[in-house]
Amino acid sequence: MEKNNEVIQTHPLVGWDISTVDSYDALMLRLHYQTPNKSEQEGTEVGQTLWLTTDVARQFISILEAGIAKIESGDFQVNEYRRH
């Protein structure tokens, strides 16, 4: 298990590619993110292609919506964001 004081490196999300794979009832997703210490044009990376079933995609959407609602409500601890 990781230590609580360990720093997690994060990268700002700047875009994505999403397409459907109708024959498998699935979606393919690639995230584009900014690499630190590089210019915007040089530093944009494209992550691996992810395969999401419709059930997993719905769960992902639900988790994102819950996170957005929590942030917008102001119902969070200040220390949650200082670690990043």
Swiss-Prot record:
Domain of life: Bacteria
Function: Represses biofilm formation in M9C glu and LB glu media but not in M9C and LB media. Seems to act as a global regulator of several genes involved in catabolite repression and stress response and regulation of the uptake and export of signaling pathways. Could be involved the regulation of indole as well as uptake and export of AI-2 through a cAMP-dependent pathway.
Phenotype reported upon loss of the gene: Cells show increased biofilm formation when glucose is present in the medium. In a continuous-flow system with M9C medium supplemented with glucose, the biofilm had a 240-fold greater biomass, a 2800 fold-greater average thickness and a 16-fold increased surface coverage than the wild-type.
GO annotation (BP), single: single-species submerged biofilm formation
Annotated NCBIfam families: PRK12301.1
Species whose genome carries this gene: Escherichia coli (strain K12)
Name used for this protein in its record: Biofilm regulator BssS
Gene label: bssS
Pfam family, one: BssS
Induction comment from the UniProt entry of this chain: After 3 hrs of cold shock.
